[in-house]
């Protein structure tokens, strides 16, 4: 577990959190978590959000290629996250 934490910190830490898309995805996750009264990590982990921000999927099939997203979570949250990515990309094109 400790090496995994360090690896993720190295891959996604510090500067990565400044990524605007990552911040937008985190905000959406926080909103969904509040609405569902669950911890944010139940929606998606930080590592999943980081991979999503890096890959910026534009379709359901691309979303399924993001680490940590399977059919169930894609069906439940995919539409909201794909819209957030599309909105972000349009605003920052």
Summary of predicted features, one role per range:
Residues 1-93:
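Accessory DNA-binding and partner-docking regions appended to nucleic-acid-acting proteins
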């Amino acid at each position: 577990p400790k090496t995994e934490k360090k690896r993720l910190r190295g891959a996604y830490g510090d500067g990565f959190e400044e990524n605007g898309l990552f911040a937008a995805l985190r905000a959406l996750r926080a909103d969904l978590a509040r609405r569902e009264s669950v911890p944010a990590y139940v929606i998606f982990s930080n590592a999943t959000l980081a991979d999503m921000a890096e890959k910026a999927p534009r379709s359901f099939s691309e979303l399924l290629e993001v680490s940590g997203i399977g059919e169930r979570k894609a069906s439940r949250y995919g539409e909201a996250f794909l819209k957030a990515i599309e909105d972000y990309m349009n605003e920052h094109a």
